[in-house]
Every structure is written in C-alpha cells, then in structure tokens.
C-alpha cells in the first residue's frame, strides 16, 4: 500500500499474494504506472519487468506451471495484444495466469475520447471482447463491484487452471476500498455422490481381477492430482506410461514405468502394453497431433476407464459431475480392497547405453541428448523448446525429481527462454536447464539478461543447426524461408547483461562433455553452451512426426 491509502489495486495484489504469487511480470505503460507503484510497494510481491510483453507473458506461464498461479500486467491495446500469443498458449495448455490490463480512465471512456493505444473510434472494449476467446473469465472493473469481480475472476482462474482477464482503468485502480475480510472463495468443482457410487460400481465390474494399466498426462498435474495418481500407481503393481505432454509427471525411474506413449511413434514395447491392456486407465489425457503420432493411438474404449477433469467414462458410460481426484481415489480403493496382488512385472531389459563417441567425434543429435539426459540431476527443471530440443529429450528417461516443461499443443517457438525465467523465479531452490534451438531463441533472446538481473544461474543450451530444422523436415529442406541469420551466440550473454556467464561453443563430443561437466560444477553463474549440429540431423521421434505432419498438410 502507498500513501494514497488502501485501494482496489491493493485489494487485487493482496488476493494474488493469497494465491501464492510473489512475483508479478509485465512491461510498464502509462495506463498502469500508478498501479505499479502499489506493486513495488507491496510487502509480499516483487515486480519483474520484461523486455517485451510477449516475453513477460511467457515468463508468467513458466511461473504459473510451478506455482499454480501467475500474474501479468500490460498496458491497454498495444501491450495486451503483444501478450495475446502467450495468453493463448496458457489457455491451450491449462496454465493459470491473471492478465491485468491498465486502461484509460472511466471519464475518458465515458466521453469516448480518442486517446492513444486505442483504435480511434471511442470503443474501449474491443480488446476485452478479444480476450473472451483466450481466457476463462473476464471483468471490466468498476468501483462499485471491483472487489467482487476480482474475486470472481481469480476464483475461476484458480478452478479452471486457465487465464483470466482484468481490465482496470487508472481511476479504478486507485479507488479506495477495504482489504479482504475472508479467504478467497474456492470452488471444489463438485462430485455427485451418486455419480461417484455408480462410477465405482462400473469400474469395479470392468476391472474384475485384471491387472490395471495407466496412461497419464499433463492434466493430472494441472488439476493438482499428482498425489492421487501416485496413490493409484502404488495400490498394486501398475504398469504405467505418460504422453510427452505429461513427461516427468511420474517417477521415470520406477520399475513399473514403461516409457512415453506416442501412438505409432512409440517404442514397440510401450505401445504393446498400453494398447493391449485388459483394462486401461487414461488419466488427464488429451490426444493431440504432436503427442499421439498424429492420432495413431489405438485405444479400445470398451476396455478403458477415462478420468477427466470433471467427468469419467467407463467403457463408454459417462459419470458426472465427478472430480478427477475423487475418481483416482476410487480406483486406488478398488485395487486395495479386492485382495489381489498382481505379480511383479518382468524386469525390463537394461537400457543399452551407447558407448560414448570419441572425444574428437563431430557432435550429433543422438550424442547430444544422451549426454544431456545423463547430466540432469534431481531437482532440475528442464524446459525444452518445441522442435529438436523437445523431441530429442522426450524419449530419454529422466532422473527422479526432474521436472520437464514443454509446450507441445500451442507449440510457439521461443516460449521456453522467458518461461525458464519464470520457472526459475517460481522456485529459486531448483536449477533450470533451458534447451532451445537457434531459430527459436532468436525470437525471445532479449530476456536472457533478466536471468542475471534476477540472480538466476541457469544452464542454457542453444542448439545451432543453422535454421528451422523442424520446418525443413516437414517441407522445404533448402528453402530460403527456413534459413536464419547466423549469430555469434557466445557473445550474447555479456551483450545482454550477463557478463559473468561462462560460455562454450561445442562442435565435438569432447567439447560438449567438458562444457556439461563444468556446468554441473558451476552453480553460481549462468553457463551458456552453444552446440553445433548438422542442419538435417533430426531426432528419430521428430523425424517420424515430421513425416506425419507433411502427409497431413498435403491432404
């Protein structure tokens, strides 16, 4: 609170702090500068400025994935539209971000004045209407109902795990009000006792004495149901897999973890167990083109229990309203109470780690991802940008306690660099590892300096394969539109404000090995590694998906 007394802006900030937000991302603009005075004065919230609104939105997304809530502040029109891509990505991938937009005063709006950052027609709700397509709740705040509307939007964002939009005019932000007197209303979503009872009965009948197999995905994490999932996985010997979207959702070092299921692009052993399971539970699963081998999954609904956010389906029969956690708990109870202990799975063949290449061997995609997977340690938060980084690492098992973040549905290249900033601020006790291609990094690299400003020490790996390799794999191998300008990457950290970063340029396996060894030993500064790869050296999984994408686009 500032010397102006307690305001609507203070109320909003207190509610955000109540939801666990301690950093607010954004770019200043004249329609929210007074509100930002209250942000920087708040005892529990820190302002984190972005190089641009898109980057700030991506950073908020990365923060929200770990914290469960994030906030972004932009100015009217020009600022909010610059952030719209990031907000749309958060909507697609179920990330709770509150987008706070500073607007011209209510007097200006009522008079339909032609002020800057507008379309010049006196209509101040163009962008509010646009926001309805990419947010779950919106409000144009007015003094009489501002606090009630703030509570409504924040509750919806928290419940639905999707972005919300608050339009707050300059005079509304400074309008006097009272602090909250009760906790923010939390909606449970609701489970009908009858729906739960009927679901349990149907699931018990379908499961019988069969071994249960589980395919889990990202929505389990978004809805806060990881503990309930783990309870199910430990109720019996339960073979399980995830989609790439849900990678690191479960402990990949478990003997019951099968690997990544991606339809026809899966390893044969994983595909066989999932598709031939007597009873398969799909938990929080959303099949999209790039995580399902372009919809090549073969899941028999008659043998499937599908656990969704608010409903579940047993062999085609729908049960609702039924929360995900309640359904998972019911399945765990069925296994625990039936008195049958499934035999242990036969030991999986020990993974055949290829011998390390000679130190002077030219670096390849295979060697890069093998060595990077080996370098990751418990507690790391790995952000892999869409493309060779995401698909190169997705097939490797991660150490217990590693968190993997990607964006396979929205698939906006460049997202992970600012998102790594947000993730690092969300949990400073964990080291972030950023894996990003050269083309993607050119879109958002301005945010690199913020890591130094905020005291973060990530490992940054830029995959330099001389352009848009994913696009080359789909179409236009030699086309000019898949080329990018060559940059002197290792000079960028210093140029952008991180002069103490350690930088490496690796063209051989030995150079990569040395760089990653130093990175593991150096925790007090950024380690920036440029790796040189052939432009058409493509991870096998990505190669298969690129062929499918090319075929789909040709139809």
Swiss-Prot record:
<dbReference type="InterPro" id="IPR012001">
    <property type="entry name" value="Thiamin_PyroP_enz_TPP-bd_dom"/>
</dbReference>
<keyword id="KW-0479">Metal-binding</keyword>
<keyword id="KW-0210">Decarboxylase</keyword>
<dbReference type="InterPro" id="IPR011766">
    <property type="entry name" value="TPP_enzyme_TPP-bd"/>
</dbReference>
<comment type="function">
    <text>Decarboxylates branched-chain and aromatic alpha-keto acids to aldehydes.</text>
</comment>
<dbReference type="GO" id="GO:0000287">
    <property type="term" value="F:magnesium ion binding"/>
</dbReference>
<dbReference type="InterPro" id="IPR029061">
    <property type="entry name" value="THDP-binding"/>
</dbReference>
<feature type="binding site">
    <location>
        <position position="53"/>
    </location>
    <ligand>
        <name>thiamine diphosphate</name>
    </ligand>
</feature>
<dbReference type="InterPro" id="IPR047214">
    <property type="entry name" value="TPP_PDC_IPDC"/>
</dbReference>
<dbReference type="InterPro" id="IPR012110">
    <property type="entry name" value="PDC/IPDC-like"/>
</dbReference>
<dbReference type="InterPro" id="IPR047213">
    <property type="entry name" value="TPP_PYR_PDC_IPDC-like"/>
</dbReference>
<dbReference type="InterPro" id="IPR029035">
    <property type="entry name" value="DHS-like_NAD/FAD-binding_dom"/>
</dbReference>
<dbReference type="GO" id="GO:0005829">
    <property type="term" value="C:cytosol"/>
</dbReference>
<dbReference type="GO" id="GO:0030976">
    <property type="term" value="F:thiamine pyrophosphate binding"/>
</dbReference>
<feature type="region of interest" description="Thiamine pyrophosphate binding">
    <location>
        <begin position="388"/>
        <end position="470"/>
    </location>
</feature>
<dbReference type="Pfam" id="PF00205">
    <property type="entry name" value="TPP_enzyme_M"/>
</dbReference>
<feature type="binding site">
    <location>
        <position position="438"/>
    </location>
    <ligand>
        <name>Mg(2+)</name>
    </ligand>
</feature>
<feature type="binding site">
    <location>
        <position position="467"/>
    </location>
    <ligand>
        <name>Mg(2+)</name>
    </ligand>
</feature>
<protein>
    <recommendedName>
        <fullName>Alpha-keto-acid decarboxylase</fullName>
        <ecNumber>4.1.1.-</ecNumber>
    </recommendedName>
</protein>
<dbReference type="GO" id="GO:0004737">
    <property type="term" value="F:pyruvate decarboxylase activity"/>
</dbReference>
<dbReference type="InterPro" id="IPR012000">
    <property type="entry name" value="Thiamin_PyroP_enz_cen_dom"/>
</dbReference>
<feature type="binding site">
    <location>
        <position position="465"/>
    </location>
    <ligand>
        <name>Mg(2+)</name>
    </ligand>
</feature>
<keyword id="KW-0456">Lyase</keyword>
<dbReference type="GO" id="GO:0000949">
    <property type="term" value="P:aromatic amino acid family catabolic process to alcohol via Ehrlich pathway"/>
</dbReference>
<dbReference type="Pfam" id="PF02776">
    <property type="entry name" value="TPP_enzyme_N"/>
</dbReference>
<comment type="similarity">
    <text>Belongs to the TPP enzyme family.</text>
</comment>
<dbReference type="Pfam" id="PF02775">
    <property type="entry name" value="TPP_enzyme_C"/>
</dbReference>
<keyword id="KW-0460">Magnesium</keyword>
<keyword id="KW-0786">Thiamine pyrophosphate</keyword>
């Amino acid at each position: 609170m500032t010397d102006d007394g307690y305001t609507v802006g203070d109320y909003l900030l207190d509610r955000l702090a109540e939801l666990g937000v301690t950093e607010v991302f954004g770019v200043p603009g004249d329609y929210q500068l007074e509100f930002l005075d209250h942000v920087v004065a708040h005892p529990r919230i820190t302002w984190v400025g972005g190089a641009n609104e898109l980057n700030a939105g991506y950073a908020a997304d990365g923060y929200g994935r770990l914290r469960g809530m994030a906030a972004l502040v932009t100015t009217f029109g020009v600022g909010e539209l610059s952030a719209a891509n990031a907000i749309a990505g958060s909507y697609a991938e179920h990330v709770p971000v509150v987008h706070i937009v500073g607007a011209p005063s209510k007097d200006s709006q009522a008079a339909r004045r032609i002020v800057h950052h507008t379309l010049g027609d006196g209509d101040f709700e163009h962008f509010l209407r646009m926001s309805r397509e990419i947010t779950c709740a919106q409000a144009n705040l007015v003094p009489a109902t501002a606090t009630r509307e703030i509570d409504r939007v924040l509750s919806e964002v928290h419940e639905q795990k999707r972005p919300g939009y608050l339009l707050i005019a300059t005079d509304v932000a400074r309008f006097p009000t009272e602090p909250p007197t009760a906790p923010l209303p939390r909606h449970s979503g609701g489970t009908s006792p009858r729906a739960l009872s009927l679901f349990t009965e149907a699931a018990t009948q379908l499961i019988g004495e069969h071994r249960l197999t589980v395919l889990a995905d990202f929505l389990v994490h978004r809805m806060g149901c990881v503990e309930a999932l783990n309870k199910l996985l430990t109720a019996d010997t339960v073979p399980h897999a995830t989609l790439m979207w849900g990678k690191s959702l479960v402990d990949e070092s478990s003997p019951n973890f099968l690997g990544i299921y991606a339809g026809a692009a899966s390893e044969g052993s994983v595909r066989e167990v999932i598709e031939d399971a007597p009873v398969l539970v799909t938990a929080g699963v959303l099949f999209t083109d790039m995580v399902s081998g372009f919809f090549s999954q073969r899941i028999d609904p008659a043998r499937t229990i599908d656990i969704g956010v608010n409903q579940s389906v047993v062999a085609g029969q729908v049960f609702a309203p039924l929360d995900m956690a309640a359904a998972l708990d019911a399945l765990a109870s069925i296994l625990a109470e039936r008195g049958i202990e499934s035999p242990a799975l036969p030991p999986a063949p020990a993974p055949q780690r290829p011998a390390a290449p000679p130190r002077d061997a030219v670096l390849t995609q295979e060697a890069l991802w093998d060595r990077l997977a080996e370098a990751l340690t418990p507690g790391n938060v790995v952000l892999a940008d869409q493309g060779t980084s995401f698909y190169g690492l997705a097939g490797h098992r991660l150490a217990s306690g590693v968190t993997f973040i990607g964006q396979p549905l929205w698939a906006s290249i460049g997202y992970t660099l600012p998102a790594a900033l947000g993730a690092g601020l969300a949990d400073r006790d964990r080291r972030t590892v950023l894996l990003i291609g050269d083309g993607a990094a050119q879109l958002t690299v301005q945010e690199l300096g913020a890591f130094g400003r905020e005291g973060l020490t990530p490992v940054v790996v830029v995959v330099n394969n001389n352009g848009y390799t994913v696009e080359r794999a789909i179409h236009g191998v030699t086309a000019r539109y898949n080329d990018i300008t060559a940059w002197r990457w290792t000079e960028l950290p210093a140029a952008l404000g991180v002069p103490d970063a350690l930088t490496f340029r690796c063209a051989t396996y030995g150079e990569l090995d040395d760089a990653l060894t130093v990175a593991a030993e150096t925790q007090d500064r950024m380690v920036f590694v440029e790796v040189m790869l052939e432009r058409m050296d493509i991870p096998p999984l990505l190669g298969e998906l690129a062929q499918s994408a090319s075929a789909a686009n040709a139809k």
